[in-house]
Amino acid sequence: MSTRVIIGVALTLWIGTLAAVQASVAMAKNEIVIEGTKLNPPLFKTTVGERVTFVNRSGRTVHVEFLGDAGRHRMFQVTNEIWAIFHRAGSHPYEVHFSDPRARTLRGTVEAAEDPSGRGDPHTCDSLTVMDECIQP
């Protein structure tokens, strides 16, 4: 095997490992990172009542749209970051829109599971809280 092939394989493995580590760090921080062409991770798993931060690293202003029940939705402008708390278990889809209409809309989902400790979420909001604003279904 040539040295170039070995270096190429090693570089590929290193890049793959780096991407996996970045995804693990984001999940450990309860963060979803908005990049120019993708969400990291696109499917985020959390627990009901946990705070999830959406971090904008795209270099552009974006709007995060939380898709609600029966077509209801709310959109929030994000220059740096926003946070949300999901008060109901289940799938919570969202979209990220860029200010440039030529940019592709990014789609993701937050999966909120019931708290296994059984402590529950002592909330007053039935669905979703974004930056201290209750979004009702």
Positions of PLM-derived features:
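Positively charged n-region of N-terminal signal peptides that target proteins for export
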Residues: 1-5
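Bacterial N-terminal signal peptides
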Residues: 8-18
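Bacterial Sec-dependent signal peptides at the C-terminal "C-region" and cleavage site
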Residues: 17-27
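N-terminal edge beta-strand
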Residues: 25-49
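Non-cytosolic beta-sheet module surface loops
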Residues: 36, 55-58, 98
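Beta-strand cores of secreted/periplasmic/IMS beta-sandwich domains, seen most often
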Residues: 42-63, 81-88, 92-93
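Histidine- and aromatic-enriched segments that form or immediately flank copper-ligand environments
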Residues: 59-78, 104-110
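Extracellular/periplasmic metallocenter environments
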Residues: 77-137
